[in-house]
Amino acid sequence: MNSYFSLSASQQRTLITQTAVRLGLPEQAVEKDLWVSIILQLVFTLPFSDKLVFKGGTSLSKSFGLIERFSEDIDLVVDRSFFDLHGDLTKKQIKGLRKKSSLFVRDDLTNLLKAAMVSYGLDEYCSVVPEDDGEGDHTYPEPRKIDVYYRTLFPLNEYLQPRVMLEIGARSLFEPTVNTSIQSLVTTQFPQIDTGLVSAHSIATAAPQKTFLEKTFLLHELFTSQRGISAERKSRHLYDLEKMMDVPFAIQAIEDDHLWGTIAHHREVFTSLSGVDYTPDIRDRIVLCPPEEVRSVWERDYSDMQQSMIYGASLPFDALLERISLLEKKFHDR
């Protein structure tokens, strides 16, 4: 097996271009996926990796192959037991957790990631930049982002910047998880090319049924508290749900009272939004489709995603909403 990093820049460019042609994706998307894969593997070699869980939409594609949109960022959760906090927390404790987590990401995680980059010779390709502190109540952003800027081989694409964003927080629900492994799109198309720098590591990953229910909860919160005014990069949740809704784990998750109750309780305690009533069972009245007055904005965002991020089949927007309406009804009628 040949290492991607033993190839010349010209050979790397050709390899990414051939992968992009096979998958019907922009070259910049394939290149970004490669760096997402490398950085994710690298993070799970760090000393505290046993306290991390990989979650979100990128896990659905990279770990489970449930969706066919390329990976853009890396969402991670730190087990709050790492900060000696357990169970339900008071508002004061949650505020303290946010500060501890934010400082940990800004200082410890960033410095260890930089050191790992140097150790594996990636510092000549990448730079690691943590999110700046804010002001006032937002001095310590949580989750806090880390941007990894990589040296691109291709012309700049406005929608696909040469940057991998890690978003790391400690308030998300940590379990249930499963162990997975990941590989880049380049390696899936050219198995003889190894794009990893580290040995295959088991990556603790949020179980897909949890991600499925959390995405439904997120859309309900968006459409009931904010009326879905901001659609930028959010239509992916509609796409993800449509892709998962007929898979057995999703069908079972809709009726899983225990898992739903755990997620609902956790969101109410740790990440509640004003304007959302968490008390009765939200499944009875869940809203998953954008309101009519903002539907065109969501359609534009979905069109952008189809062109730049999806490498498999995807429905027209109207057909997508028909399917999501059906999913909404399944929750109501369970």
Residue ranges and their predicted role:
Residues 61:
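Betabetaalpha-Me/HNH-type nuclease active-site subdomain
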Residues 54-58:
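Glycine-rich beta-strand-to-loop/alpha-helix junction loops that act as flexible
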